[in-house]
UniProtKB/Swiss-Prot annotation:
One of its GO terms (molecular function) is translation elongation factor activity. Signal peptide: none annotated. InterPro entries: Elong-fact-P_C (IPR015365), NA-bd_OB-fold (IPR012340), Rib_uL2_dom2 (IPR014722), Transl_elong_fac_P/YeiP (IPR020599), Transl_elong_KOW-like (IPR013185), Transl_elong_P/YeiP_cen (IPR001059), Transl_elong_P/YeiP_CS (IPR013852), Transl_elongation_fac_P (IPR011768). SUPFAM superfamilies: Nucleic acid-binding proteins, Translation proteins SH3-like domain. One of its GO terms (biological process) is peptide biosynthetic process. This is Elongation factor P. It comes from the Bacteria. The lineage of its organism: Bacteria, Pseudomonadati, Campylobacterota, Epsilonproteobacteria, Campylobacterales. CDD domains: S1_EF-P_repeat_1 (cd04470), S1_EF-P_repeat_2 (cd05794). Pathway: Protein biosynthesis; polypeptide chain elongation. It is found in: Cytoplasm. Involved in peptide bond synthesis. Stimulates efficient translation and peptide-bond synthesis on native or reconstituted 70S ribosomes in vitro. Probably functions indirectly by altering the affinity of the ribosome for aminoacyl-tRNA, thus increasing their reactivity as acceptors for peptidyl transferase.
Length: 187
């Protein structure tokens, strides 16, 4: 199905030259003279590169053949990550470039969304909020009560986030995976 210029918006998935992209940012421009156009920044699902593209009135782009599947992350083995389709129990192996930044939030057994383009896995999305255990952080000292103060904490997946001083090693916290920020302790 063709997508017209007027339908473009942030987050929309499009295909140009056989490559699937996500619109990261767009701006509708209406110059004093001439026809309106859309200037957009689009990110490739295949290599992660962001390019700027201008769409003119009448331009069309295709809707990509993308399928999102819920899969279970099994384990990491060298340079591959093993996933299992929770419906068919079929296993697939993805490399570092396919998994990307999601790897620092993934725990064995976690359910993730794997994006497939023409039946080939191209990216992995983790939940926006995950609960992870702190394996290393500096101890608290008396007087560390300033609410704005933060300290680095290493999580069980190896990711490092800034946490308030009252958070201790061994505690489980919720983290926003998009902003990489501490949200709260898990009770």
């Amino acid at each position: 199905m063709a997508i017209g210029m007027s339908e473009l918006k942030k987050g929309l998935k499009i295909e140009l030259g056989g490559v699937p992209y996500r619109i990261v940012e767009y701006q509708h421009v209406k110059p004093g003279k001439g026809a309106a156009f859309v200037r957009a920044k689009i990110k490739s699902f295949l290599d992660g590169k962001v390019i700027e593209k201008t769409f003119h009135a009448g331009d069309k782009c295709e809707e990509p053949n993308l399928v999102e599947k819920t899969m279970q992350y099994l384990y990491h083995d060298g340079d591959t990550y093993q996933f299992m389709d929770i419906e068919s129990y079929e296993q697939i192996a993805l490399n570092d470039s396919q998994v990307g930044e999601a790897s620092k939030w993934m725990l064995d057994g976690m359910q993730v969304q794997v994006l497939l383009h023409n039946d080939k896995a191209i990216s992995v999305d983790v939940p926006q909020v995950v609960a992870l255990k702190i394996v290393e952080t500096a101890p608290n000292f008396k007087g560390d009560t300033s609410s704005a103060s933060k300290k680095p904490a290493t999580l069980e997946t190896g990711a490092v986030v800034q946490v308030p001083f009252h958070v201790l090693e061994g505690e489980i916290i919720k983290v926003n995976t998009e902003t990489e920020e501490y949200l709260e302790k898990v009770k």
